[in-house]
Design a protein with these regions (language model features):
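Outer membrane beta-barrel strand-and-loop segments of large Gram-negative receptors
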Residues: 438-442, 481-485, 490-495, 590, ...
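Membrane-proximal, glycine/serine-rich, low-complexity loop/turn segments characteristic
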Residues: 20, 64, 99, 116, ...
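A short, solvent-exposed loop/turn motif at the edges and junctions
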Residues: 47-52, 74, 78-90
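Outer-membrane beta-barrel translocator domains and adjoining extracellular loop/strand segments
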Residues: 251-256, 297-308, 354-366, 412-421, ...
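Short, acidic Ser/Thr/Gly-rich low-complexity loop/linker segments typical of extracellular
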Residues: 48-64
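C-terminal extracellular loops and terminal segments
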Residues: 205, 650-654, 671-743
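Structural signature of Gram-negative outer-membrane beta-barrels, strongest in the C-terminal barrel
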Residues: 404-409, 434-440, 446-466, 478-613, ...
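Short, ordered, surface-exposed loop/turn motifs in non-cytosolic proteins
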Residues: 25, 33-47
């Protein structure tokens, strides 16, 4: 019955908003005979269909003009000056290009008097870019007060994997940017941390499925760009907010028999502030959030069935007490009309303590054969500093910019392990200290053309991540011996790109090429007995991208895309030191991993009407040398039941799918939007060799399955002007390496009421109302089968208040 209710509610709930964009038109007027500039000449822009004036301008002392905020559409541009014959050009602004340089316009002297044209008019418009979807968080009521990961839950084509990573169209190979830049906070290609970034100070989130050559080549599934709020009004303005919540309100499955169990009814307190002060040519901005909470980020129940008849069950709850502070700020300087400079920085520090008691029970004998408890103390810190210089040439949109960025990520993690079984009673302690330092320098050049623009750029990025590993073993230690005490990973990236955009009346084209040279090394402690050789390699690769759009009408267009992408394993995927939160399911990296490459194809269509729009797409992606985690029994020690979960390159795979997004305003107070994403994952058969902790073969059977997800959101207004949002999400079964991930669903609900003469608002939000969004996986390995059920904290209720000034 509950599933039926959820299914029906899905049809009343993932509202998305396309970014709104206007265009700029520039040029310069000359006398055709003397080649002198024509100051104070008239430029008018009329609609093409009925020749009605839309807007216009008067040239400056040098004959230049710049007309801003022109809606997308088709126009006639008239140039006139007293004593000269007027001339006219056609202009097509379809959304691909935002700045049009009409170049040098010559007027011929004439004896006929010209009628002066009056300049008026402005109107808003909607960007029709088929490649980028922009989501405003202002109206995301059902997830208000939560994290960026919570906010993305209802976005079309977005899912999450077992480790809390964003999955776009079936893949977690996603690049996450903050204000257009990568940082150690969200990872360099290997995303992380989204579940710990509050969404209160985020203005919008962009999802780009087919990035152009301007973007780094990593992340074949796409790019997620998180954009912080930044006001442009003069004076002091901003907002201050406070959110309180309770999480893990119910249990999807009873805890196993331990004293601690799993945390429930977890309190959460998140104060936030957003400040902006602008005076003259200087703008100061600051955002800050603090998180004080108890949480349950993982709560995994495991059932393992071995070929010899043994059946073992366990539960690993990650009971967390956490404090986190994030400060993001900077200063914008307008040095003069042509030069600007921005200095910005981000500081993020988080400390948490995780505790767990884990009982391993033999189902056949109904006896506990092992009791394990652990305590993890971890401090993470991220520092990001950048300086951005921008030069604006005389021509609007003609810019040269340079960015210098330094980012540091620190991880200091200590595990205290206590183990009790028939073969040992003892204690172990491990500590990992990892400090990542990244320096990047990039420059970008943009030159508008008459019907497009050209973009050029270059980038240098240097990354270093040394790791210190300290073990304090007890008697009969469960820690693998001979791991060594250090490793050192580094990557140097040299890149350059060219990107060209051309926009015509019936079509537009964007084509680019990115070249990247990458040098990688990974030095290991010579003591390490499992990976005896250091690793070092380099490669040069080209990454083309192309987009073609055909316009049936301004509101009806088709696009075709192709791009080539890469996903490089980062140090977390390479790390040789196991994670001991579950001693019988040890997660470990592979220092010999290699990058995976993907060719992506897509055909998309968008049709818009006055009260809504329909987007549809067909996509196909071919991946070579993909890497993923492999489950394998470690039988090197007969006293322990250990399954390793090791990263490994596993050959080729394909991903083919369709996506639909529809949005409709039913009335002025009722909006309905929905998305559907269906895809086929094909994982090819593969045989390989695992080296840790002993060399052994594994076989990956070919897997072919169809999966889909659907999201529906309704927005409506209740009495007393209370805005409401109801969201439903459903993910079907899907194939994963060595098994399946089972279906799951969620219903979220939110209310928002403006108070204090609309200077404030109060929100109430409830996520996963029926507590059905846990992740369940079934794995078939060599010599065993297993079922993993992660009922982590998804059910949360929050109350928030915000004051705007």
């Amino acid at each position: 019955m509950r599933n039926t209710i959820i299914f029906l509610l899905l049809f009343f709930t993932a509202h998305y908003f396309y970014a709104q964009d206007n265009v700029i038109v520039t040029g310069q007027l000359f006398d055709s005979e003397t080649q002198e500039t024509l100051p104070f000449a008239n430029v008018s822009i009329n609609s093409f269909a009925d020749n009605v004036l839309v807007t216009g301008a008067i040239t400056d002392i040098d004959g230049r003009f710049e007309i801003q905020e022109i809606p997308l559409g088709k126009y006639k541009v008239y140039f006139s000056f007293i004593g000269y014959a007027s001339t006219q050009q056609n202009l097509v602004a379809g959304g691909l290009n935002t700045i049009f340089d009409l170049g040098k316009i010559e007027l011929k002297p004439s004896t006929e008097a010209l009628m002066e044209v009056q300049v008026t008019g402005k109107q808003a418009t909607t960007n029709s870019d088929l490649n980028k979807k922009t989501f405003s968080l202002e109206d995301n009521i059902a997830q208000s007060g939560g994290s960026v990961l919570d906010a993305m839950k209802t976005m079309p084509g977005v899912a999450f994997d077992q480790e809390g990573k964003v999955v776009l169209r079936g893949s977690d190979k996603v690049v996450v940017l903050i204000d257009g830049k990568q940082s150690s906070l969200t990872g360099f290609g290997n995303q992380k941390g989204l579940g710990n970034i509050p969404a209160s100070n985020i203005e919008k989130i962009e999802i780009i499925n087919n990035p152009s050559a301007k973007y780094d080549a990593n992340g074949f599934a796409g790019v997620v760009n998180i954009i912080y709020k930044k006001e442009k009004q003069t004076g002091l303005n901003g907002d201050i907010g406070l959110s309180f919540g309770l999480g893990a309100l119910g249990k999807s499955k009873p805890d196993t028999n331990t004293d601690l169990g799993s945390f429930s009814v977890n309190p959460k307190l998140i104060p936030s502030i957003n400040l902006n002060y602008k005076k003259d040519k200087v703008n100061y901005f600051l955002q800050s959030e603090f998180i004080l909470q108890e949480a349950l980020p993982n709560n995994e129940f495991t059932t393992r069935n071995y070929e010899d008849g043994r059946n073992i069950i366990s539960q690993v709850p990650e009971n967390r007490k956490q404090f986190r502070s994030i400060i993001n700020g900077g200063i914008d300087f307008e040095l003069d009309n042509k030069n600007s400079f921005t200095i910005s920085g981000l500081y993020d520090r988080e400390k948490h303590i995780d505790t767990a008691q884990v009982a391993f029970t033999d189902l056949n004998k109904n006896t506990r054969n092992r009791f394990y408890n652990w305590r993890e103390e971890e401090v993470t810190r991220y520092i990001n500093a950048s300086a951005n210089y921008r030069h604006q040439f005389e021509q609007a949109g003609h810019t040269l910019s340079a960015i210098v960025q330094y980012t540091q990520g620190l991880e200091d993690e200590t595990y205290s392990l206590n183990d009790s079984s028939a073969v040992r009673v003892g204690r172990d302690k491990t500590n990992i200290l990892a400090i990542e330092n990244t320096t990047s320098i990039s420059t970008d050049y943009v030159r508008p053309l008459k019907s497009g623009r050209i973009e050029l750029g270059a980038k240098l990025r240097i990354r270093r991540l040394p790791v210190e590993y300290t073990i304090t073993p007890g008697e009969q230690s469960i820690i693998y011996p001979d791991l060594g005490t250090f490793s050192d990973w580094g990557e140097n990236l040299f890149a350059g790109y060219v990107n060209y955009l051309m926009e015509k009346e019936d079509y537009d084209i964007e084509a680019g090429l990115r070249a990247e040279q990458t040098d990688v090394f990974y030095d290991l402690d010579p003591v390490n007995a499992y990976y005896p050789n250091n690793d070092k390699y380099n490669y040069f690769e080209l990454f083309p991208s192309i987009r073609y759009t055909y316009k049936l009408k301004d509101n009806n267009r088709f696009s075709a895309f192709y791009n080539r992408r890469i996903d490089r394993p980062g140090e977390p995927e390479l790390r040789i030191y196991p994670k001991y939160d579950d001693p019988e399911l040890l997660k470990v990296g592979n220092p010999y991993l290699r990058p995976q490459f993907t060719d992506a194809f897509e055909v998309a269509h968008k049709y818009s009407w006055t009260t809504g729009s329909l987007f549809s797409a067909i996509y196909h992606r071919m991946t070579k040398d993909q890497y993923m985690r492999i489950f394998s029994i470690d039988d090197s020690n007969p006293d322990y039941e250990i399954v390793n979960k090791i990263y490994q390159n596993t050959g080729d795979a394909t991903n083919t799918g369709v996506e639909f997004l529809v949005s409709q305003d039913i009335t002025n107070t009722f909006k309905l939007s929905a998305s559907f994403n269906g895809y086929e994952n094909v994982i090819k058969e593969f045989e390989g060799t695992l080296l840790f902790p002993v060399e052994r073969q594994f076989t990956l059977a070919e897997s072919n399955d169809i999966a889909w997800d659907a999201k529906i959101t309704s927005e409506f207004v209740l009495p007393w002007e209370i805005a409401a949002q109801l969201t439903g999400v459903y993910f079907s079964n899907k194939n994963i390496p060595q098994g399946d991930q089972l279906a799951r669903s969620s219903i979220d609900f939110g209310l928002k009421k403006n108070i204090w003469d609309k200077n404030g608002e109060i929100t109430i939000a409830a996520t996963d109302v029926f507590n059905t969004f846990g992740i369940r996986q079934e794995i078939v390995g060599n010599g065993f089968t297993s079922r993993y059920e992660n009922y982590f904290e998804t059910q949360v209720i929050r109350v928030g208040v915000k004051y705007k000034f």
